[in-house]
From Swiss-Prot:
GO molecular function, one term: ATP binding
Swiss-Prot/TrEMBL keywords: Amino-acid biosynthesis, Arginine biosynthesis, ATP-binding, Cytoplasm, Kinase, Nucleotide-binding, Transferase
UniProt subcellular location: Cytoplasm
Pathway listed: Amino-acid biosynthesis; L-arginine biosynthesis; N(2)-acetyl-L-ornithine from L-glutamate: step 2/4
Organism encoding this protein: Prochlorococcus marinus (strain NATL1A)
Site (Transition state stabilizer): K47, K260
Predominant subcellular localization, coarse grouping: cytoplasm
Protein known as: Acetylglutamate kinase
Amino acid sequence: MNKEIQQANHSKNINKPFTDKDSIRVSVLSEALPYIQRFANKRIVIKYGGSAMADKTLQNAVFRDLALLSSVGVQIVVVHGGGPEINQWLEKLGIKPVFLDGLRITDTETMDVVEMVLTGRVNKQIVSGINNHGRLAVGLCGIDGGLIEARTLGGGSHGLVGEVAKVNTKILSPLLEEGYVPVISSVANSSDGRSHNINADTVAGELAAALGAEKLILLTDTPGILRNENDPSSLIEKIRLSEARELIDQGIVKAGMKPKVECCIRSLAQGVNAAHIIDGRTPHSLLLEVFTDAGIGTMVMGRG
């Protein structure tokens, strides 16, 4: 009886009219094909942060997107932040977060919390999420394998906040070639062995440059670069490198967006083909950027 029911349902599906929604699905798949072919065996570095980390539905969408990208042969590297969870733990411990120029001021006590949260909690949650969708992710931080060497930022006005002094990609290349997805937290040691908190956008940009990545993609809580930060309709869809610098000089790009645009500029200046600032609050924004003609967010182009 069950077999007869299955056969009947199969016959119904065969005879079911082809709808406009079906046409859209086929069109989307067809549109994706040249991009799948183009980015097979190419490297894309993705900075994962913002609301896409806090909302469970968005989390799952990102993990699925990452698994799909890896499944079709794109060599994915994920660099993650963890600001909201860091703030939650600092609050639990009675430590007030302080920021300067969009970067967290990090004393020794705060650094202990940052390292615990990023490497011990957030990193493993992301690895587990990707693994649950059928791909093999590997959790790392900048300390592992000497991946990143930190240097204290400026004159130490931000405390144990670092910048990237050196990148050693030897640990990453074999993992990527074997189809693993490295998931990297932005904690690294300086030459004197002290742990530093490096802005995750900065780490993503420097890794993209060192790996010769095709793309750098930053997931954010904004539609992209806005000429007016209070007006989503002022989105700049494409911008040249020189124009991005001008927006910083003019004070249009500021606060938390400033380090994001600066890391795009540095990565492009070092050979990355394109950098994208996209809205991680939009479900499957990664796939929309990589596999569609229109893309999403702001594309910063390397020439000009």
